[in-house]
Each structure stands twice: as structure tokens, then as C-alpha cells.
Amino acid sequence: YITIGLTLAIVVIFYIVGYKIYISQEGIYLRKIDLMVDWSEVEGLSHVWINEFRSRTGNANFYNRKTLVIYRKDYKPICVYNISLLSLFVAKLYSPKIKTNIVFASLATMVNVGLNGWVFYQLFFAGLESMNLGILFAWMGLFFLKALILPVIMTSLENRTHGDNLFHDTAYEKNRSKVVHL
């Protein structure tokens, strides 16, 4: 009963909120700009993390936007921000011949989930008294890798494959990527 209740709650929430993209056998429909991209136009798909720089009064932080990038043959790529890795799997299901970075994106997501799970376990089950300085430094190093190094590697690999289109935000420039932003 819990599973059915959760499923219904999720369906109702997403029905109210709406969707960003719709993936079908014909192609990918982008709701925000009312554009249908046929599979024949799609050169490749990738799921990358693009760092967004946010600056508020006295506060500055990076946020990793999980982004689906749709590379088109004769046009600029399209970035759909804050979207799940599952969209890449669904696209691969409908168009198996399309080039993707599904393996590397899946590994990066597993690292993210594993690291967050480790922190959750340590804080809520093992307790703070079992944590020592070595674990704290390990967390700091792994979060540095996750937040800064991994997104840079992901975008540089995609830029090497599809041309220099994806760039991270800096303190001086936002949305530097040469793409259509959604």
C-alpha cells in the first residue's frame, strides 16, 4: 500500500508541475520552446554536470546543474538543466544508435549517490562520536572531487567529442555555454 500511495503521489505532483521534455519514438519534444527534435537531427546526447556560480551578499557557492545536452547536426546544442540521468536511458531506449556518455554519466551519478549515502549513514546511524579527523578530511577531498573536478572532466570530455560548446559559470560570467539554455 505504501508503494501504491507513493506512486500516486509522484504521478499527481508531476502532473501538476509539468514536464520539461517528452521523449518518444519520433524524437525529443522540448515543452518550454515548443520544439520537436527528430532523432534524425540528433547527433548525440550527454548528461553532464555544469557548475553554476551563485553570489549573494557575502555568500558565494557553486551548484552542479545536472544537464541533458542535445547535440543537433546543423544547429546549436540544447541544454536542459536540472534533469535526471534516467532521461538519457529513455532516449537510448528509443534510439539505440545515438552516441551518448551513458557509462561515464552513470559512474559519476553512482559516486554522487554513494558519497551522499556515506554522509547520511555517518551522521544518522554511526553517530558523530565515531567520526574522526581522517574521515572528515576524506569527506572534504571527495566532495572537492565531486563538486569541482568531476564536472570539469565531464564537460571537457564532451567538448573534445562535440566541439567547445559547454562552459562552467565563473564569478564574472554566467551561462557562458554556446548553447540554447532551457
PLM region spans:
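N-terminal first transmembrane alpha-helix
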Residues: 1-16, 46, 125-132, 136-138
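Sequence-level detector for tyrosine residue identity
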Residues: 1, 15, 19-22, 29, ...
